[in-house]
A protein has these predicted regions:
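Positively charged n-region of N-terminal signal peptides that target proteins for export
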Residues: 1-4
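Bacterial N-terminal signal peptides
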Residues: 7-16
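Blade-edge motifs of beta-propeller repeat domains
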Residues: 21-37, 66-81, 111-130, 163-172
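Beta-propeller blade termini
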Residues: 40-47, 84-91, 133-140
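Acidic carboxylate motifs that coordinate Ca2+ or other divalent cations, activating on Asp/Glu
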Residues: 50, 94, 143
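Intrinsically disordered, low-complexity segments used as extracellular stalks/linkers
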Residues: 53, 64-66, 84, 97, ...
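Hydrophobic beta-strand segments that make up the repeating blades of beta-propeller
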Residues: 55-58, 97-103, 148-152
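Short glycine/acidic-enriched loop and turn motifs that connect beta-strands
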Residues: 62, 106-107, 154-157
């Protein structure tokens, strides 16, 4: 019985390989920006609250690519500071998407006022924390406020979390 099953499986994979192992997917690349110099990170969120997904990018600055809903994007600069990682999250609980970003020596967040304007806030800016590479937000301590998690590479090799106290300040 085992030989019959193996023979059947070999026969079907040789005779009908496209039906069993092949799926016909079509992926088409669309350019959002051709000027995102040294882009390192992207995140998607409805930044402007209009119902379509926008794109954030971390590179020599932090950019927001506003989706107009018809596959066209308008570029906005959130910060002129370089960023190795960006993440969209409502940090202040006001219903709009803020942006968290990390760079070589700092982690910051950019408060969205709901009209496309962003105020800069520093979470961590320590000279000894060189090499922040990744940033994320979640409610680590389950107090209802989104906290920030950041990972750094050499020489620190640390993963840190910063507690959001609910008043737009972060404790180390």
């Amino acid at each position: 019985m085992k030989h019959v099953l193996i023979s059947f499986l070999l026969f079907t994979t040789v005779i009908f390989p496209t039906r069993i192992f092949s799926h016909h997917y079509s992926i088409i690349a669309h350019t959002i920006s051709d000027s995102a110099r040294e882009a390192r990170s992207v995140s998607a969120a409805d930044v402007d609250g209009d119902g379509d997904m926008d794109v954030l990018a971390g590179h020599n600055n932090i950019s927001w690519y506003e989706n107009d809903g018809s596959e066209s994007f308008t570029t906005h600069t959130i910060s002129t500071s370089a960023a190795s990682s960006v993440y969209a999250v409502d940090l202040d609980g006001d219903g709009d998407m803020d942006v968290v970003g990390s760079s070589a020596g700092s982690v910051g967040w950019y408060e969205n006022d709901g009209s496309g304007n962003f105020a800069t806030h520093t979470i961590c800016n320590h000279y000894w924390h060189r090499g922040f590479r990744s940033v994320y937000a979640l409610d680590v301590d389950r107090d209802g406020y989104m906290d920030v998690v950041a990972a750094s590479s050499s020489p620190n090799n640390k993963i840190m979390w910063y507690e959001n106290d609910g008043s737009q300040y972060f404790n180390h």
